[in-house]
Amino acid sequence: MIKLILGLKITIIKLITFDLDDTLWDNGPTIANAEIFTRKWIEKRVGRVEWGNFDDFINLREDLIREDPSIAWDISKLRKEIFKKKINHLVTSSEAEVIANDAFNMFINKRHEVELYDGVANALKSLSMDYSLGVLTNGNADIYRFEIGKYFDFAISSLEAKDSKPNRPHFDKALQKIDGISFAEMLHIGDHQINDIFAANQLGIKTLWFNNKNTKWVQAFEKPEDFSDWKKLPEIIEELYE
């Protein structure tokens, strides 16, 4: 925003970037519903599948990433590979390929059935009038599939960055999207203490921590300003940076 100092206009913040999952919406129920729906859809086509527990899922995920490190940031491809691994002993390899692709399409549609936190849409509308807005996400949600997408100037996923936060490529690419800005003129908002707050902080980017679950701050560096109510966000930013 713009501040008047000795008659001169000084811009403090030009760009605000946002995490998506668990920042704009509660991602846990969304992913759980998408997973349940997709598994039922698959089993109608191949019969009963041994899905295993959460530890099994994580172990399979890690095995697949060891086989192909690039899918660590291509999580859409990773999920397709997980589906294939789970059913390839039940159908032919070509059938597994088709079913996995179709299943992923079902999953990704359900994955976008989110419920925004109260106040998100109005806050983004208000902020977009004064700032450039961007998305920096490790996930595969597409902000432009939502009505609120119209408020954003760009969105960078791990697939585009070819890396994941807390590494810096997301933030470097954000600078390339808006001409003439520096990290010092950015504000990043997210829920994750490492992937969002630490990542931005170490680059000199200003941060706001979304903490709607009253989570304890456990990092070695100073706790940033936080908020839990999206309806208050424009006012908080105005107080801090105008």
Label for each model-derived stretch:
Residues 1-16, 28, 94, 121, ...:
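Asp-based, Mg2+/Mn2+-dependent phosphohydrolase catalytic module
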Residues 9-118:
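N-terminal helical cap/lid subdomain that shapes the substrate entry/recognition surface
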